[in-house]
Each structure stands twice: as C-alpha cells, then as structure tokens.
C-alpha cells in the first residue's frame, strides 16, 4: 500500500477526491448488493459504503465479486486500508461518507469480545485495553487530551514555568495515612500524593511554577470520584493574594472548558454533553461563598422537600451530598472559602483575625460533580509554621527543606491543585471517574 494516507478527521478537505485511510472496522451492516462499514482511526468515526455493481464495473465480474465479498465478511476490529471517494452526506452525523472503491485487509480480527451488545462494567474493565476502542471511550480520551493541552497553554500564557516534582519522597504533603510506602535502598520512601511542597521551593526560585504528573493516594474508597493513581496539576505562585488566586483558578477552569469546546466538539456530541451548560460556565462568573455561610445555607434548607443530606454544624466537614447541593443551589462552579483549620492541612495560612479558619478554597462543580480544585495560601512565617507543626506533633526534621523556605526571604505565596480525571469527568458529563483515565487504578483494580 503506497498511497498517501489521510486521517478521518481531515476528510472534509478532500470532498470529491479519492483518498486512502488506515482504519479499524468498528461495525458493519447491509444486505444484498450494498455494505455499510463503520470505520475508526483514532481521530473520528466515519461510514464507508460499498456498492457491488460498482466493484464489478471497475474490476470485472470475478474480481469484483471477490472484493465485495471481502467487505461483506469483515469482522469487528479488523484493520484495513480503505480507498474511496469522499462525499458530503447531510444524513451522517460526521457530515461526510466514503464511497468505497477498494479495501485491503491489514490484520484479521476474530471473535472480538466487546460486541455491540450491552456488557457489564466488570467485563468492560477487565477488557479495558479493548474498551478504549469504543466510540464513547475514545471521546472521553479526546476530551482528556484537550484538557491537558489547554493546561500547558494556559500556564505558558500566564507566565508559569513547568517544574517537575519528584515521585519518590520521604515525607507526606498531607495525610500520611494515605501514602503508598516502598523500599528505597533499605529506607522507607513514599509515592507522591502531591508535588506541592517541592513546588513551593520552585515558586521561591522562579516565581510562578506548575507541575503535571501522576500522584498516588492509598484511600480505601469505592466512590465514583476516587482513584488510587491519578494525574494532578499543581500550581504555586509567589506574591499573589488569596483573591487573585481565586481569579486565576476561575480563569484556568474556564480555559479548560473552552479548550474542549474548541478542540473536541465532536467528542462532546458523541457523549451527548449539554454544550450550552458548558458555555454558561464560561460566560457567567463563578460564585464565592464562605464555609460558614455555606453551612448556614445548608441548615436553612435541610427541611426542603428536595434535599437529601445530613445535618451539619459549624466545624463539620462537607460530604458529597452537601457539595452537590451547594453547587446546584448556585448553578455554576462555586468556590467555598475559609474552611476550619481543624480539618485542613498544616501549611495553610489562617484568616487574619480568625485563626480557626484558613485562607483556602475548594471549587465545587455543578451537576453533582463535587470538588475539582483545592487550593490555599501557605503559611509564610517560620515561627508560626513551626508552632503549628509542634501543635500537631509533627517531626520537623522530616520537613527541614520546607522550613528553610521560610528562613531565607519568605514571601506571601499560595497554590492550588486539580485532579485531571475529575475535570475530565465533569466536562465530559460521564458518571464515573474510572472512564476518565486510560487504565484506572482503584481499591480492587490494578490490571490491566
């Protein structure tokens, strides 16, 4: 096969021309003298149509029959080179169709396990390496790719430098009970749960930094929003106020949504995502509400007919039902700010005049998707941070490098982190986070 190949996504530029595409057979149908072949190549799905009389006219009676029979006998996921004339077709969701003139089999496929019928989740997860080939899973991966692309673009445009934090560490950024431990040449080491502590060093050197990579949390959680291995974007910046940080986070999330609308509109269409809702999240300002005001709101509405959450007092942490109600109440992504210090990380800076609250924020996504961003201002005073660590009984020797940052020219600084899979799930409108990463790692799943 020596013809130049094009991608399915580019066929719009070749209307009326004969092209060759390398693809897999997603499905086929037809009867008699016509065959419909659903093709995919990773960029899009596309329908090819083969007419038996056309093959006989072009190749003769015997060869025409043989070539058409090859198409009729194609199995799902057979790989092919398919040649044909690109035609516009208003009936097609893609807008185009291929009038097949030739087809060459590259690799046979027999008894492909994921047939067009319905399959259970466990079966699909056991065959995740194949499930990724399906239309909806491909769409989710395209949305993930668009979000990653938009992340790098946004931080580059806003003066941030990519700063790679280590995966292996001897200390915890947050809850030490959620760490995966491994042996490091006879010493205990832990897989990173956040690059934040190292990013703070980066911010003191470079001003504005971000990292993007896998993190690990040994949470024994079975919810639809938790993975034990996921990809995290952490950003850290010097000389930025709490309000400026919230502005930056809002601009970032809006840039991610816009990036998907621009780069993966067909994926949103495949997933039947409410695009108008996504556009509204871009155009309308995000809401900001204090933790204490949010608790008061929850208390005022807990007797409402449509509420389904437990009573909370000031000082209690939100559960998923509370987060869902808050974001749905406001109808747009909502920042809840200034949580109690009692259940937040040791490094968060207290609210001036109110040491029981810290300068932090969680961004809650509407439609039941919950927290997608967590961020805070960091305690920049050495003595105050040491006192907090002593109060919590922490071993300061494990954080000597972190404390050094407060001894040599400390400045106001803060940061935030976003789990990419949660953002993908929200933008894609899918129900479970396991579909937002190629090979999910969960409490009872470590293969394939």
From Swiss-Prot:
EC number of this enzyme:
6.1.1.22
In the record, what terms sit under GO molecular function? asparagine-tRNA ligase activity; ATP binding; catalytic activity, acting on a protein; nucleic acid binding; transferase activity
| An example Gene Ontology biological process | asparaginyl-tRNA aminoacylation
CDD domains from the xrefs? AsnRS_cyto_like_N, AsxRS_core
Please state where this protein is localized. Cytoplasm
State the top-level EC class: ligase
Database matches in Pfam families: tRNA-synt_2, tRNA_anti-codon
Q: Does the keyword Glycoprotein apply?
A: no
Chief subcellular location: cytoplasm
Q: One GO cellular component from the entry?
A: cytoplasm
- Reactions catalysed, as given in the entry: tRNA(Asn) + L-asparagine + ATP = L-asparaginyl-tRNA(Asn) + AMP + diphosphate + H(+)
In terms of InterPro entries, this protein maps to: Aa-tRNA-synt_II, aa-tRNA-synth_II, aa-tRNA-synth_II/BPL/LPL, Asn-tRNA-ligase, Asp/Asn-tRNA-synth_IIb, NA-bd_OB-fold, NA-bd_OB_tRNA
UniProt keyword terms in alphabetical order: Aminoacyl-tRNA synthetase, ATP-binding, Cytoplasm, Ligase, Nucleotide-binding, Protein biosynthesis
The superkingdom listed in its UniProt entry is: Bacteria
What binding partners and quaternary form does the record give? Homodimer.
Give the protein family.
Belongs to the class-II aminoacyl-tRNA synthetase family.
Q: What is this protein called?
A: Asparagine--tRNA ligase
Lineage of the native species? Answer: Bacteria, Bacillati, Bacillota, Bacilli, Lactobacillales
């Amino acid at each position: 096969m020596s013809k130049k190949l094009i991608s399915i996504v580019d066929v719009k530029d070749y209307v009326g021309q004969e092209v060759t595409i390398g693809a897999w057979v997603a499905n086929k149908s037809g009867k008699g003298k016509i065959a419909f072949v659903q093709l995919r190549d990773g960029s899009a799905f596309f329908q090819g149509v083969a007419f038996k009389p056309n093959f006989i006219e072009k190749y003769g009676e015997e060869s025409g029959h043989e070539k058409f029979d090859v198409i009729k006998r194609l199995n799902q996921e057979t790989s092919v080179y398919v040649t044909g004339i690109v035609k516009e077709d208003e009936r097609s969701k893609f807008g185009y169709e291929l009038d097949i003139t030739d087809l060459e089999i590259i690799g046979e496929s027999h008894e492909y396990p994921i047939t067009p019928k319905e399959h259970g989740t466990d079966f699909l997860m056991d065959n995740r390496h194949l499930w990724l080939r399906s239309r909806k899973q491909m769409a989710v991966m395209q949305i993930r790719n668009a979000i990653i692309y938009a992340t790098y673009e946004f931080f580059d445009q806003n003066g941030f430098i990519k700063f790679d934090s280590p995966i292996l560490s001897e200390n915890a950024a947050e809850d030490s009970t959620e760490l995966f431990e491994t042996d490091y040449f006879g010493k205990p080491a832990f897989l990173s749960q956040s690059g934040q502590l190292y990013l703070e060093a980066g911010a003191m050197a470079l001003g504005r930094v971000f990292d993007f990579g896998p993190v690990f949390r040994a949470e024994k959680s079975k919810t639809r929003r938790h993975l034990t291995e996921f990809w995290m974007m952490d950003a850290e910046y010097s000389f930025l106020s709490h309000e400026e940080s919230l502005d930056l986070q809002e601009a970032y999330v809006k840039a991610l949504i816009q990036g998907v609308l621009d780069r993966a509109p067909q994926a949103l269409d495949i997933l039947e995502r409410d695009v108008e809702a996504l556009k509204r999240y871009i155009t309308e300002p995000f809401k900001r509400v204090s933790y204490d005001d949010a608790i008061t709101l929850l208390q005022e509405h807990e007797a409402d007919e449509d509420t389904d959450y437990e009573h909370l007092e000031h000082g209690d942490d939100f559960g998923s039902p509370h987060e869902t109600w808050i974001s749905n109440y406001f109808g747009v992504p909502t920042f809840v700010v200034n949580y109690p210090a009692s259940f937040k990380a040791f490094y968060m800076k207290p609210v001036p005049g109110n040491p029981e609250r810290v300068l932090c924020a969680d961004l809650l996504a509407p439609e039941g998707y919950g927290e997608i961003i967590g961020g805070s201002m960091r305690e920049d005073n050495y003595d105050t941070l040491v006192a907090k660590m002593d109060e919590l009984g922490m071993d300061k020797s494990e954080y000597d490098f972190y404390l050094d940052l407060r001894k040599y020219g400390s400045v106001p600084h803060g940061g935030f982190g976003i789990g990419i899979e949660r953002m993908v799930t929200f933008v894609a409108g899918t129900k479970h986070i396991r579909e937002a990463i190629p090979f999910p790692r969960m409490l009872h799943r470590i293969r394939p």
